[in-house]
Swiss-Prot record:
Forms a complex with VapB5. The gene is vapC5. Its main location: secreted. Mg(2+) binds at residues 11, 100. It comes from Mycobacterium tuberculosis (strain ATCC 25618 / H37Rv). Residues 9-130 form the PINc domain. One of its GO terms (molecular function) is magnesium ion binding. Keywords: Hydrolase, Magnesium, Metal-binding, Nuclease, Secreted, Toxin-antitoxin system. This is Ribonuclease VapC5. Probable toxic component of a type II toxin-antitoxin (TA) system. The cognate antitoxin is VapB5. Has limited RNase activity on substrates; activity is seen with a VapC5-VapB5 complex. Belongs to the PINc/VapC protein family. Its cofactor is Mg(2+).
Length: 135
């Protein structure tokens, strides 16, 4: 039985799940969490692309809820990890959306798991120290 890690990186899907009322397995979410600049960008796109003012307000509230959270940047270590993961995917014949690849690279470069509801990360689980926790 695995234990909940001390810290982790929340993927965009966790914020969207909260916004839309999807259930999260809170017991698997670490006490210390951060997110990435990539997730912030995805949440901002959601605000800008909202079809109605009500949806825009809801998405803006989600974006604002992240304001005080530690936001991890894409740095040289993350870029090196991204390149390793990209080659791993090419060699294994699998694909991951580009933003998810960046989120995984930022997390793995800091030895942190990705906390997500997306199945998209499955192709990376275990690759180059990537740990994925589905909540």
């Amino acid at each position: 039985m695995s234990t909940t890690p001390a810290a982790g990186v929340l993927d965009t899907s966790v914020f969207i799940a909260t916004e839309s009322g999807r259930q999260l397995d809170e017991a698997l979410i670490p006490d210390r969490v951060a997110t990435t600049v990539v997730t912030l960008a995805e949440l901002r796109v959601g605000v800008l692309a909202a079809a109605t003012t009500d949806i825009r307000a809801q998405r803006l509230a989600t974006l604002e809820s992240v304001a005080d959270m530690e936001t991890l940047p894409v740095d040289d270590d993350a870029a090196r990890m991204w390149a390793r993961l990209r080659i791993h995917l090419a060699e294994s014949g699998r694909r991951v959306r580009i933003n998810d690849l960046w989120i995984a690279a930022v997390a793995a470069s800091r030895a942190l798991p990705v906390i997500t509801q997306d199945d998209d990360f499955a192709a990376l689980d275990g690759a180059a120290s990537v740990e994925i926790i589905r909540v």
